UniProtKB/Swiss-Prot annotation:
Function comment: Voltage-gated sodium channel Nav1.7/SCN9A inhibitor.
Lineage of origin: Eukaryota, Metazoa, Ecdysozoa, Arthropoda, Chelicerata
Keyword Protease applies: no
Localization, UniProt: Secreted
Name by which UniProt lists this protein: Mu-theraphotoxin-CCy1b
Disulfide bonds: C3-C18, C10-C23, C17-C30
Keyword Transmembrane helix tagged: no
Organism for this UniProt entry: Chromatopelma cyaneopubescens
Superkingdom classification of source: Eukaryota
Molecular function as annotated in GO: ion channel inhibitor activity; sodium channel regulator activity; toxin activity
SUPFAM superfamilies with a match to the protein in the record: omega toxin-like
Protein keywords: Disulfide bond, Ion channel impairing toxin, Knottin, Neurotoxin, Secreted, Toxin, Voltage-gated sodium channel impairing toxin
Length: 34
């Protein structure tokens, strides 16, 4: 499965962002997390 990279739209309830990224609940896109 392809993951979602930086600034890609996402669904916080079904987070498909890449490793080290998290779906931001407010902005609805993948943000980098340390």
């Amino acid at each position: 499965d392809d993951c979602l990279g930086f600034f890609k739209s996402c669904n916080p309830d079904n987070d498909k962002c890449c490793e080290n990224y998290k779906c931001n609940r407010r902005d609805k896109w993948c943000k980098y997390v340390l």
